[in-house]
Amino acid sequence: MPNSHGNVLNNISLNSKQNPRSISKSCPNDKDARQKSFKTISAQALVRVQGAGYKLGDVKLKDAEVKEKNSLKKYDCKNATQEKKEQEQVFEKTVAKGSVQKYITKTSKTNSLFIGNLKSTVTEEMLRKIFKRYQSFESAKVCRDFLTKKSLGYGYLNFKDKNDAESARKEFNYTVFFGQEVKIMPSMKNTLFRKNIGTNVFFSNLPLENPQLTTRSFYLIMIEYGNVLSCLLERRKNIGFVYFDNDISARNVIKKYNNQEFFGNKIICGLHFDKEVRTRPEFTKRKKMIGSDIVIEDELLASNNLSDNARSKTILVKNLPSDTTQEEVLDYFSTIGPIKSVFISEKQANTPHKAFVTYKNEEESKKAQKCLNKTIFKNHTIWVGPGKDKPVHNQIGTNKKTKVYLKNLSFNCNKEFISQLCLQEKIRFSEIKITNYNSLNWTFCGHVECFSRSDAERLFNILDRRLIGSSLVEASWSKNNDNILNEIDYDDGNNNENYKKLINISSMMRFRTQELSAHQKGLTSQFQQVVSPFSSYSNSYTNMNSLVATPMKPHPAFNLITNTVDEKLHQPKRTKQENAEILESLKKIINRNLQRISISGLNKEENLRSISEFIFDVFWEHDSERLSHFLLMTNTSLESQKILQKQVTRAAESLGFTV
């Protein structure tokens, strides 16, 4: 036993000397670790030798363990290789299967038809029962709302055979289908392209009051010239559209029916393109290539050859609700007769709109003015009258009238002010009349009758678009009825009963006789010349700054206010905190409007502060209540925005900014 012990130790020591380089290169810590591991191994070897009795058995055991580990590694490698091959085979099968499915999908193409104008009660089962007579019919789909699951009024029909799809379209297109006339056409995603490839034919002056001219009969006539994708008859306008699948068919139809009789009426037809396409720069070149004689740019041009005056066919509709659409106006006014066009003016939200409706015939236009005036439309009383051209300012050369109509007159632009102005400018007049009061913007309307055309032209040039008393005066050569429903008749005399109602309006009662404040009296004459449009009135009662909303002399009707009432009108003085708040609001609103004012340097904080304080001190005389009300109006009133911009410009000029 002692000898075996020594042999084992010698064997271990010999094994440890097989790689002397690694030992020599090791650090001292590694040597200590190796010595400890050697001691542990030697101790284990002693135990094995003592238990087995000889060294050979221990060596055989080690060899067996090594062989077993090698065999396990080979088995794992073989299994991994086999699994990889199996995965590759599965992938190849999947790819082959997918390619077959793609090939099947390509070869078995479905022909889809769009079916529109379906009744809400029509279901997919009802569609299947009708179209199952075609052998290649596959399925029917009714499109529904995602949340409510209600029918959207259209769906799709799928056929395997293209011929069956065409037969179904010709048989059922524009026929009554469960109580409604349906439209069936090929499913096309790019409708804009379909409408603008030169195959959309427009028809005007169709006799749609003729019961024989139905959409179905119109469709059957048009398919004789080619494949019709869809057609439309607009009975409210006596117009129609036909979409062909090629431009040759479209040209043949135009050649056949343009300026020809159709069901007893002489009609006009031509190629039609959407407005979006017509406004593109390249459309002019395209129009020349197609032929300008067969292109109709707008449906309004289709009736230019008619002898009636177009102006007499147009009516003006006022006080329409702000949410009114063209379709609603078209439905309401087409009860009188066919309409050529409808135009709704664009105004700000929550304000009454007006519309211009043009009829086909002058008789129907007169009938609409008589029957629909002051009727209820969407809970609003509308005003219907003759349509007039929009007033064009400063085009006086063609005018021979001597009466100038004025609107947006503030309280300080009263009869006395206008008469003093005429005397100063040597304008001869026979009458100055204030006729109406507008309750929406607290302004007056009136007119001035001059002796001659030259006097009227001079007065027009002086007052038109002039800011007087916080209101932008508008002059015109014809009476404007835009706010006729919001106006109160007014007489210059003090016995007007209607005007007494105005006295109870607290917001207006604060306009009273005042004298210039101390800070305004201290202004230099040069500054007064800059801010006042009529600087030569400095010695009269009209020398007040024209941009100040409070007048120097009140309107004659306000003489009815007694002294007792006038004493109650005095407002309590505002605190510094309230003034600071209104100045901060004014500064923010001015900052928002700077993009409309081309003055450099105003966007700086200190400059905005100076401009705001100047406007508050000079133009509004520290009256924070009136200024706060005015700032609220700037959110909805374009006129108030223009007034504020004018005040900012005048203030910037006075403070030395380059305008």
UniProtKB/Swiss-Prot annotation:
UniProt cross-references to SUPFAM superfamilies, sorted A to Z: RNA-binding domain, RBD
Gene3D superfamilies: 3.30.70.330
Disulfide bond annotation, renumbered to this chain: none
Domain RRM: 111-189, 199-267, 313-389
GO molecular function: mRNA 3'-UTR binding; poly(A) binding; poly(U) RNA binding; RNA binding
Subcellular location: Cytoplasm
Compositionally biased tracts (Polar residues): 1-27
Region (Disordered): 1-35
Keywords assigned: Cytoplasm, Repeat, RNA-binding
The keyword Calcium is annotated on this UniProt entry: no
BP GO terms, sorted: mRNA localization resulting in post-transcriptional regulation of gene expression; mRNA metabolic process; regulation of translation; sporulation
InterPro entries to which the protein is assigned, alphabetical: Euk_RNA-bind_prot (IPR050502), Nucleotide-bd_a/b_plait_sf (IPR012677), RBD_domain_sf (IPR035979), RRM_dom (IPR000504)
GO cellular component: cytoplasmic stress granule; cytosol; nucleus; prospore membrane; ribonucleoprotein complex
Presence of the UniProt keyword RNA-binding in the record: yes
Assembly and oligomerization: Interacts with MEX67.
Extra information: Present with 98 molecules/cell in log phase SD medium.
Protein name stated in the entry: RNA-binding protein MIP6
Species classification: Eukaryota, Fungi, Dikarya, Ascomycota, Saccharomycotina
Gene name tied to this protein: MIP6
